[in-house]
């Protein structure tokens, strides 16, 4: 059956030539990102458990995970959590298969602890956090969808959005958080995982504002704190120079009051220890960024089942399509993908698969159009590949 694939030329100023561009990334220790990470870790663990015990992924969604902030007393050289962070794993899961009960809550709790242990390395899981699990049972109608031996049927009438390639600013913002928390943190353990990077490009001038919770036990005093934040600034300036020749100004923890020694210190590395709650889907989109200059879906991607939940599959799929078009089709400057499903219809037959392309100057759009159609059709023909990639942990969702 022919697919409704529409590729059109977009008469719009390319992102790099627009006057103003804004890009944001919430770091992996931001309360919203922790919620995303927990939800996705639980979903992937349930997928593996279902495959092992049942031979296939059964119905589940864990995309309602919530974090309620605790209270803490951070200080130079130490500090303590006074009231633990409360983390609630919420959603639906299939708890019985062919008459046998499945230990879904135990699987979820183990996955959550493992995720926190590997991500929030300064969080004491015995003292600093309470993890609770409330997984209901999915409806029989939805569970039946997973039993059909064919391409899964869409769970909803919804859409997914993706774009490529990353702009200079998008690359800078994304990689600043990643490199600060991997490369620089390996030498400066005081850097907390709770970090926000906000990028502004005004013409050829880029401003990066970094908000980073430092971990008190690794910071001896105010002078040490100042030296560390200055090193973060210098590191980021050098990193940004790899991606752009534009002017870059970096600002770190601009809310600090150095005269009053009032600075951004934490005990665990996340502001969830003191006043900041978190929810799934309030942070980064599945490409790892928040990009108001680009089309975006407001759907949470993390925690949704990877079989037929359009909010997950089509956002991931559209992003992969866009990236492959840029890789495989010459002379594409910007590409935007939108996929729209119809509830109950096969996910490889979207109501429309739309690509809007800004070609490079002097390019024949007819050639670009036909090649882009092939990429889109090929991905839709192999749509379940996204499911396999998610279960194997090959695709990030935030």
From Swiss-Prot:
Q: What is this protein called?
A: S-adenosylmethionine synthase
Q: Which InterPro entries match?
A: AdoMet_synthase_2_family, AdoMet_synthase_3, S-AdoMet_synthetase_arc
- Show the GO MF annotations: ATP binding; magnesium ion binding; methionine adenosyltransferase activity
Among its keywords, does the record have Transmembrane helix?
A: no
The record's annotation in Pfam families points to:
AdoMet_Synthase
Q: Please state the Enzyme Commission number of this protein.
A: 2.5.1.6
Q: Which residues bind ATP?
A: 136-141
Does the keyword Isomerase belong to this entry?
no
């Amino acid at each position: 059956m022919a697919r409704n694939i529409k590729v059109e030329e977009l008469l719009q100023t390319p992102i790099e030539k627009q006057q103003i561009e804004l890009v944001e990334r919430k770091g992996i220790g931001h309360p919203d990102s922790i919620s995303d990470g927990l939800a996705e870790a639980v979903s992937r663990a349930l997928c593996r458990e279902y495959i092992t015990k049942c031979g296939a992924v059964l119905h589940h969604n864990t995309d309602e995970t919530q974090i309620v902030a605790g209270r803490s007393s951070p200080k130079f050289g130490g500090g303590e959590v006074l009231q633990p962070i409360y983390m609630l794993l919420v959603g639906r899961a299939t708890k019985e298969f062919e008459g046998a009960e499945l230990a879904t809550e135990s699987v979820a709790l183990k996955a959550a602890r493992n995720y926190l242990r590997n991500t929030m390395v300064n969080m004491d899981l015995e003292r600093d956090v309470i993890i609770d699990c409330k997984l209901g049972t999915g409806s029989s109608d939805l569970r039946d969808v997973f039993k059909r031996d064919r391409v899964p049927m869409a769970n909803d009438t919804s859409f997914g959005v993706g774009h490529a390639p990353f702009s200079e600013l998008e690359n800078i913002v994304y990689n600043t958080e990643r490199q600060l928390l991997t490369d620089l943190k390996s030498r400066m353990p005081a850097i907390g995982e709770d970090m926000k990077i906000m990028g502004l490009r005004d013409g050829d001038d880029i401003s990066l504002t970094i908000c980073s919770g430092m971990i008190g036990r690794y910071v001896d005093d105010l002078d040490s704190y100042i030296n560390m934040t200055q090193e973060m600034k210098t590191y980021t300036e050098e990193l940004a120079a790899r991606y752009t020749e534009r002017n870059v100004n970096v600002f770190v923890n601009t809310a600090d009051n150095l005269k009053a020694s009032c600075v951004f210190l934490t005990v665990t590395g996340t502001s969830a220890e003191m006043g900041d709650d978190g929810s799934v889907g309030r942070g980064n989109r599945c490409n790892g960024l928040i990009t108001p200059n680009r089309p975006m879906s407001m759907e949470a991607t993390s925690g949704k089942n990877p079989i037929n939940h359009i909010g997950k599959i089509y956002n991931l799929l559209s992003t992969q399509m866009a990236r492959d078009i840029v890789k495989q089709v010459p002379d594409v400057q910007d590409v935007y993908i939108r996929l729209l499903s119809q509830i109950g219809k096969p996910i490889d037959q979207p109501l429309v698969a739309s690509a809007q392309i800004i070609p490079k100057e002097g390019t024949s759009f007819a050639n670009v159009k036909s090649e882009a159609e092939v990429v889109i059709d090929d991905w839709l023909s192999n749509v379940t590949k996204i499911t396999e990639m998610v279960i194997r942990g090959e695709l990030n969702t935030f």
